[in-house]
């Protein structure tokens, strides 16, 4: 019984490692596709009044699809 418990814990740990590795691989692929638009830390605010598609495209902090949700919130 104890050996089955140990085997189950090891199996769960292995599965979690596989999932984490797969997520990291997907993030690397996404970063390569986006080129210079890799994830970066937010260093300054874009005021909500200036949150436009053009401003978001040229911003280091936001991806276009997230801009409307995050402008002015850093």
Swiss-Prot record:
One of its GO terms (cellular component) is nematocyst. The record marks 61 as: Key residue for binding potassium channels Kv1.2/KCNA2, Kv1.3/KCNA3, and KcsA (occludes the channel pore like a cork in a bottle). It is found in: Secreted; Nematocyst. Changing residue 58 to A: Important decrease of KcsA potassium channel blocking activity. This is Kappa-stichotoxin-Hmg1a. Keywords: Cleavage on pair of basic residues, Disulfide bond, Ion channel impairing toxin, Nematocyst, Neurotoxin, Potassium channel impairing toxin, Secreted, Signal, Toxin, Voltage-gated potassium channel impairing toxin. The lineage of its organism: Eukaryota, Metazoa, Cnidaria, Anthozoa, Hexacorallia. Its main location: secreted. Changing residue 55 to Q: Loss of KcsA potassium channel blocking activity. Potently blocks the voltage-gated potassium channel Kv1.1/KCNA1 (Ki=75 pM), KcsA (Ki~1 nM) and moderately blocks Kv1.2/KCNA2 (Ki=2.5 nM) and Kv1.3/KCNA3 (Ki=3.1 nM). Also facilitates acetylcholine release at the avian neuromuscular junction. Blockade and dissociation rate are sensitive to voltage. It comes from Heteractis magnifica (Magnificent sea anemone). Residues 23-39 form a propeptide.
């Amino acid at each position: 019984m104890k050996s089955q418990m140990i085997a189950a814990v090891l199996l769960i740990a292995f599965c979690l490692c596989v999932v984490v590795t797969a997520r990291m691989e997907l993030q690397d692929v996404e970063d390569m596709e986006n080129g210079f638009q890799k994830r970066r830390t937010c260093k300054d605010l874009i005021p909500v009044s200036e949150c436009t598609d053009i401003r978001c495209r040229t911003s280091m902090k936001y991806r276009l699809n997230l801009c409307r949700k995050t402008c002015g919130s850093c």
